[in-house]
Design a protein with these regions (language model features):
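Thiamine diphosphate
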Residues: 1-90
Length: 90
């Protein structure tokens, strides 16, 4: 998505209808974050039977460390996104 608001629900729905899979990654806290809204909206719109896998990747619900090495441990990384994508298609 290029924008968070308004977000292109039609584009996400078209992709989800084609693949049956949804992966939302963002740096905000995963619980109650934008990714949860995207997944919930798509489930409401397409129905759970049409979604094979829906995953969210976000920050854990903990304070963000000041130390860069510790911060890097909890950040959403390309490796974490790839791992979640592989799990979604397994």
């Amino acid at each position: 998505l290029r924008t968070i608001w308004p977000w292109d629900q039609d584009a996400v729905a078209a992709s989800l209808e084609k693949t049956g899979r949804l992966l939302v990654a963002h740096e905000a806290v995963e619980v109650g974050g934008f990714g949860a809204e995207v997944v919930a909206t798509m489930v409401d719109r397409l129905g759970p039977a049409n979604i094979k896998a829906a995953r969210r990747i976000g920050a854990p619900r903990i304070p963000i460390p000041f130390s860069p090495p510790l911060e890097n441990e909890i950040r959403v990384t390309p490796a974490k996104i790839v791992a979640a994508a592989k799990a979604a298609i397994a």
